């Protein structure tokens, strides 16, 4: 999948920091 789908599945924005992504 592309990055947009990756972030969308996590429920975070493309501008989210790595820490926010890990928390998601």
UniProtKB/Swiss-Prot annotation:
Residues 3-24 form the J domain. GO terms for biological process: DNA replication. The keyword Repeat applies. InterPro entries: J_dom_sf. It is found in: Cytoplasm. One of its GO terms (cellular component) is cytoplasm. GO terms for molecular function: metal ion binding. This is Chaperone protein DnaJ. The lineage of its organism: Bacteria, Bacillati, Bacillota, Bacilli, Lactobacillales.
């Amino acid at each position: 999948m592309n990055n947009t789908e990756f972030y969308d599945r996590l429920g975070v924005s493309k501008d989210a920091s790595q820490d926010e992504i890990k928390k998601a």
